[in-house]
Amino acid sequence: MTLMTRTLALLTLLLALSLAALPAGASGAVTIGLGDQNWNTFNQPRFAALGLKRVRVVTPWNVALSRGDRAWLDDYLRNVRAAGMDPLVSFGAAHPSHCPARPCRLPTTAAFERAFRAFRQRWPWVRTIGVWNEANHRTQPTFRHPERAARYFNVVRKRCRGCRIVAADVIDDKNMARWLTRFRSVARGARIWGLHNYRDSNPRRGQRYGGTKLLLRTVRGKVWLTETGGIVRFVLPDGRTLFPYSERRANVALGRVLRLARQYRGRIARLYVYHWQQDNFGNRFDAGLLDSTGKPRPSYHTLKRWLDTRWFTR
């Protein structure tokens, strides 16, 4: 064996050993997108500077059958398409549902199927679907009905062959694992699971659990963090402040969730940061990368830096 041959053999062996030593989930890169309800986000220079190609929007489950909602989503998707972006459209409760108060309307499977067929007919180019947003949360009619949510997924899977489907999009509340166990007993062929992991990204003092590791243990397949980020301020409906205003804390939270996604990037395939800019109407939930004047917050610059690392892609 020549010196060159021995050297090449040694390098090959070292490469193999280094790859074997990597922790599970250390391969691949996590795709980052933005969750936002405002279509005018996509023509802003600061948004263009991030180079993002994925966006998530939440819309009523019967959007294609509701004139006002349909017109709004038409405008939104028109701007998404003009910006060359791929939308993830996630369904949720329809007006005038006010869960957990009344009315709290859970559509029948047949009604959901009629609405989804109309959706496919109007927007056939949308091929990335979230079946139901935060389906295990008490503000959703699916809260106590995971089996019904699973039947919605079965409908979407049947009617959208070849689509990327987020089977169950859950928030990391205490009921998450139990809810998913019931969901999985009815769902057929789920491959992508969505999570809003605010307990991991924004842990509170005394909190004993987050949802990401639990979800990874509970389900098989890929996980998309469909809504996450750093909370600047959050006021509860009863007026109590859960998170007082702090851009610094929000920036730390965003870094925390990006490191978590990096750690589990073999399972976590996508991450949608929520949201772009705080509005001028006093929204109770503020996690914007920009403040209400359009000034970038520290979290904007943190996201921009992480996007340029090898662990993440657009």
Could you describe each region identified by the protein language model?
Residues 1-11:
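Bacterial N-terminal signal peptides that target proteins for export
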Residues 9-21:
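Bacterial N-terminal signal peptides
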Residues 26-60:
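Boundary/entry segment of secreted carbohydrate-active catalytic domains
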Residues 30-36, 55-57, 85-91, 129-131, ...:
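Hydrophobic faces of well-ordered beta-strands that scaffold small-molecule active sites
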Residues 41, 65-72, 97-220, 228, ...:
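Active-site cleft segment of glycoside hydrolase catalytic domains centered on the general acid/base Glu
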Residues 55-61, 73-106, 110, 131-132:
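Structural motif corresponding to the early beta-alpha repeats
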Residues 81-85, 160-161, 219, 264:
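Helix C-cap/helix->beta junction micro-motif
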Residues 258-267, 281, 290-314:
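Aromatic- and carboxylate-lined catalytic core of secreted/periplasmic carbohydrate-active enzymes
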